[in-house]
Amino acid sequence: MNSDDKLFLLDAYALIYRAYYAFIKSPRINSKGFNTSAILGFVNTLEEVLKKENPTHIGVAFDPAGPTFRHEAYEQYKAQREETPEAIRLSVPIIKDIIRAYRIPILEVAGYEADDVIGTLATEAGQQGITTYMMTPDKDYGQLVSENVFMYRPKHTGGFEVMGIEQVKAKFDIQSTQQVIDMLGLMGDASDNIPGVPGIGEKTALALVQKFGSLQGVYEHLDDKAIKPKPVSYTHLTLPTN
């Protein structure tokens, strides 16, 4: 690969779920009674990317079966999520066969989620000067955006939204894409069943990050009157030390 290449990395399950629920009110049932909504939506999205963007390199990342290192670190990780709809479960093997027919690599690593794989590859490619697009509706990917790495988000109204550094900063009202990590660390992430600091929501998390710059900055100023609730609420934070 070289700096003239264009790499697309697709978050498979995020796009499959999105496709399935896009047709939830009018599912695409074939003559055999099989719900093809997820398959149709995913393939339409893939075709649109291939024709519109003409990437030189592309890969589709899947979550592996079984727990990941996050489940080992936090037993309740994603514990609140309902079981995968049967139509999606039955569609995934077919979607994988279709991806293989396109001769597109399937990226799947035991113990790691698709976003871990995408994040690693996107960061490495970006550091090599390769223009890289992470295709997902997941806001968490904002922390990975850099000079050469972009989010490629499907829009509810159709089409896609490309988000670079300035777009991510504007969306979250932050000064650095790295502050996405600090925001989520303080407020938690309900979609993944990850708790934040008790009593801290999105508005307070944003205010703290804007005032102190980072989660580490908050930790270093626990005696500041701007930090509420009481400092004891922050004692569960595990922060790296240099």
List each model region and its residues:
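Noncatalytic, basic helical substrate-engagement surface that gates or grips nucleic-acid strands
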Residues: 2-135, 139-162, 166
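Helix-hairpin-helix
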Residues: 190-210
